[in-house]
């Protein structure tokens, strides 16, 4: 999968089917949008437009905790069939007018011929752009537009907010169910006090990024991959 972090005036991309969203965690709801774009049409290249950072983190200066490292997010998108990802820093597009986003990024740069998003997708300056505006622009330019309905779990839409709440409460089973796969993170192994080794239970100490969301303090069964 090709990854691009900035928008230029010209693009060599073929016609694309674009999935729009932050895709924080690539949970089951996100997967529905991504698969819809990936399975749209063989003549259209499956692509994703996303942001490099969590929108709320940039706007409010609060740390919500990312559900998936950027490299893991990219790997998951590729796993679901995405061949191109545009992922600029949110700060570079947050003041863009909705119409400029549609024309400049979706149509001119990404060559979108089909667009997919969730029903609550917002974009542009002050989040002024919505699905109705996007639908009208797509219809005017002969571009397919599809709103993918939410995926429900116990009658409630799957969301990154629910997953964060589950992790903070230590409910890994719920978080995994909403994600559609085991929660994962990665960190650098660092030396500790070697107490586990002395007790006969060697452990691995990891240094996590301050951006990561770490589950509630406790003991968890995990599968660990080292140097992989």
Where are these regions (language model features)?
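Residues at the starts of beta-strands that form the adenosine-phosphate
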Residues: 43-47, 83-84, 113, 144
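Glycine-rich, highly charged phosphate/nucleotide-binding loops
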Residues: 64-73, 94-102
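Glycine/Thr-rich phosphate-binding loops of Rossmann-like dinucleotide-binding domains
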Residues: 56, 95, 125
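Short acidic-hydrophobic, aromatic-tinged amphipathic segments that line or gate anion-handling sites
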Residues: 1-9, 86
């Amino acid at each position: 999968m090709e990854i691009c972090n900035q928008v230029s005036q010209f693009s060599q991309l073929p016609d694309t089917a674009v999935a729009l969203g932050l895709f924080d965690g690539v949970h089951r709801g996100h997967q529905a949008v991504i698969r819809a774009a990936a399975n749209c049409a063989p003549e259209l290249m499956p692509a994703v437009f996303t942001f490099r950072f969590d929108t709320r983190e940039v706007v409010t200066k609060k740390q919500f905790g990312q559900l998936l490292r950027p490299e893991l997010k990219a790997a998951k998108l590729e796993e679901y069939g995405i061949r191109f990802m545009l992922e600029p820093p949110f700060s570079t597009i947050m003041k863009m007018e909705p119409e400029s986003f549609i024309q400049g990024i979706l149509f001119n740069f990404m060559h979108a011929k089909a667009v997919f998003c969730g029903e609550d997708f917002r974009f542009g300056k002050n989040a002024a752009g919505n699905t109705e505006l996007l639908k009208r622009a797509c219809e005017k330019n002969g571009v397919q537009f599809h709103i993918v309905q939410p995926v429900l779990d116990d009658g409630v839409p799957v969301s990154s907010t629910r997953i964060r709440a589950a992790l903070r409460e230590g409910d890994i089973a719920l978080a995994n169910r909403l994600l559609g796969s085991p929660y994962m993170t990665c960190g650098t192994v660092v030396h500790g006090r070697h107490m586990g080794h002395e007790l006969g239970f060697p452990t691995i100490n990891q240094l996590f990024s301050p951006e990561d969301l770490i589950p509630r303090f406790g003991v968890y069964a995990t599968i660990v991959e080292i140097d992989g």
